[in-house]
């Protein structure tokens, strides 16, 4: 395996090692928090705080994981000398990447609701901008096609938006019952999307050949399912 091949498995490896175990902990703490609040089950008082704190790390981790995936996809599509748009476009994309990362850090640190909303939107726009680049493969961009709803990329965008909402609205979720209910609904949807991501991510990994295999694989006729 080349350096490029190792970079391509960085995103799924981090998801398996860090993100999905964290999802399990956050979901378990969420269930315990709800039991303690609604059913008066005697769980330790810290379960709510732990759920909130770990959920915050999960949300930020998911956004960072998506940024890693997009960066690798764009940077390794072609050798540096053949990069489409040259140094100018590479510089612009680097600024977008750094700005998105800085916005995520600012969202993490901001206290005012208006600032949290602004930085969450800026972060999402940055993710969408990087994801819209031609180097990023998407199964379909047509919401009316079935392929769109099977897309690992678009499900990733959706779960990123849900994570940013949870991160930005965290103080209000703790105080407002209506937002708390909305957060529960969003979290259930996010859990379903994470399951979908596990399936579609595995599917897409099977379709990505190693660097030295690409010339032979891409010479095949995928419609007729034949290789020379």
Go through each PLM region and give its residues.
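Membrane-embedded alpha-helical bundles that constitute the cytochrome b-like, heme-associated redox core
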Residues: 1-228
């Amino acid at each position: 395996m080349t350096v490029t091949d190792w970079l391509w498995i960085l995103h799924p490896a981090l998801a398996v090692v860090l993100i999905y175990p964290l999802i399990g902990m956050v979901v378990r703490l969420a269930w315990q928090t709800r039991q303690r609040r609604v059913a008066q089950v005697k769980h330790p008082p810290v379960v709510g705080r732990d759920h909130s704190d770990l959920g915050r790390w999960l949300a930020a981790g998911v956004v960072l994981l998506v940024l890693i995936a997009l960066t690798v996809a764009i940077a390794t599509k072609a050798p540096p000398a053949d990069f489409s748009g040259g140094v100018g476009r590479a510089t612009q994309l680097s600024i977008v990447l750094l700005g998105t990362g800085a916005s995520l850090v600012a969202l993490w640190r901001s206290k005012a609701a208006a600032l949290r909303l602004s930085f969450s939107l800026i972060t999402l726009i940055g993710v969408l901008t990087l994801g819209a680049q031609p180097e990023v493969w998407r199964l379909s961009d047509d919401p009316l096609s079935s392929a769109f709803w099977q897309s690992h990329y678009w499900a990733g965008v959706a779960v990123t938006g849900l994570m940013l909402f949870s991160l930005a609205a965290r103080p209000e979720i703790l105080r407002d019952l209506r937002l708390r209910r909305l957060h529960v609904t969003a979290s259930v949807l996010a859990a379903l999307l994470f399951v979908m991501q596990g399936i579609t991510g595995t599917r897409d990994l099977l379709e990505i050949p190693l660097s030295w295999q690409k010339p032979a694989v891409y010479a095949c006729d995928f419609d007729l399912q034949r290789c020379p």
